[in-house]
Amino acid sequence: MQGVQEQIEELQMKMAFQELTVEELNQEVIKLNQLIAHQQHQIQLLIGKLKAMEPSNIATQAEETPPPHY
């Protein structure tokens, strides 16, 4: 059976490892949040560009006359 000191040291090592893991995961979450914010901004820019585009000269399907074989 392990001594109390060895058990304490093992718990301290596990805790240090978990703290490191939590910090690494936190950094990844921060990066992903920044990426999401950037992508949302890009989507908003694209939406603005699409709304600003001139309407197409091509007729919609409802406006098209059916082909002669109908």
Swiss-Prot record:
Signal sequence residues:
none
InterPro entries the record matches: SlyX
Protein family (similarity comment): Belongs to the SlyX family.
Q: Which PANTHER family match?
A: PROTEIN SLYX
Q: Which HAMAP family match?
A: SlyX
Q: Can you name this protein? A: Protein SlyX homolog
Species the sequence originates in: Shewanella sp. (strain MR-7)
Name of the coding gene = slyX
